[in-house]
Every structure is written in C-alpha cells, then in structure tokens.
C-alpha cells in the first residue's frame, strides 16, 4: 500500500485570516512539505471547501487554493461542503484508486476541518500522521493559534494520529514509499 499527503482547505480567504507573518511562515512550511512529498513520489491530494462563508463560494477569489502552494497538473482536488473531507465527497475513492492506506495531513483550520478529517480517516482504518507545523488556524475562543494547535496535538497524539514535525517528514515519507 501507499501514503498520500492531504492538503486541506489552504484557500486564499482562510489564509488571509492569519496574521501576515504567520501566513508567510505557514506557506513556507507547506512549500517544503510539498517538495518532500513530491520528491519521494508520494501523491498529493488537495481538499477545497465550497460554500459558507461567502468568501469560499466556488469561483470567488477566496475560494481558490493559495497560488503559492497550488496543485501541479494531475494532482486531484476534492471539493467538500462539510468539515470532514470524507463526508459526501469522492475522497475515499481517490485514495482507493491511489492504493493509499496511510495519510500525512496538513492544512487549515486545525480544530475544524483538519481535526474532523484526521478522526474520520483513523475511523476508516487509515494510518494517520499529522504534520506538526503544517496545519494552521485563526485564534478564537480566547485561545491563541498555538494554544489551539498544542491542544489538538495532545488530544490526537498516539491514539488517533502520529504527530511528526515537517523536518522529519522526508524520512517518514521515504520509509513509507520504499515499503
């Protein structure tokens, strides 16, 4: 079997909600993650949210995948309407066609779409790795982004997903793709 990298909802409208310095650092990390995945032959699958809020309506500028990390020709984009990227989408079919049984997950928003997709992937029997510094969110509920991300790592770690920093991703992907 094989692994795939999921890039969830890194769309212009969501990226623009991050502080400019955080947005730049996040995009830079994602660029390196994408380079590592592609260098090891790991397929990259994008997920794009369609719908509310208004900025994510299909065809609007905010709906587009951020150009800095845009898919290469042939890399699939799965359109979704719910937090869980598997719900009422063709994601399971795309992953099945690719022979994937392990997912490396990146994207936005940590406590919403990333969390829901990681949990559903694990429930469906995928081995799941969350790339520790390749997911982001906006501050909310009196919590900073770092507090939200750290909490998600504590909740998901080991029981649901491995947590791996992007600096160790290439080696992890190389091991999986050479099996």
PLM segments and residue spans:
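A short alpha/beta connector and helix-capping loop motif
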Residues: 19-46
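N-terminal nucleotide-binding beta1-loop-alpha1 segment
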Residues: 6-10
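Short, glycine-rich nucleotide/cofactor-binding loops
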Residues: 17-24, 104-109
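Short, well-ordered beta-to-alpha junction loops that form the rim of enzyme active sites
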Residues: 49-50, 108
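Active-site-adjacent betaalpha module
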Residues: 2-4, 31-40, 55-179
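Short acidic, Gly/Ser-rich segments with clustered Asp/Glu that frequently serve as metal-coordination loops
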Residues: 12-16
